[in-house]
């Protein structure tokens, strides 16, 4: 009797694993770091900076599928660490990006004074690790 019970439990467990497979999920956030410099190429340290991050599809000048803004504070080395996907959304939805339909590029715009007078500071292709 115990033997049949154990077999039944094992079969049910196997069926559960077979019928309900785990699916991979796209990330809802992405870590990003940058060193912020002003127009005189001096480090911007220990102050709020304005940032606008865009995810572009197709090329470095492609269509913006997601845009957000953030106002992080730089550290003593001018470094900011942010999570893309947790800022103030300007357009698009980070969760709705179809990562299989790339390539995708990240465009970073900054305002070292903490405002919204952004200038493009870089565009680079997003690559998996």
Per-segment meaning from a language model:
Residues 2-129:
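Family-positioned intrinsically disordered, low-complexity linker/tail segments enriched in G/S/T/P
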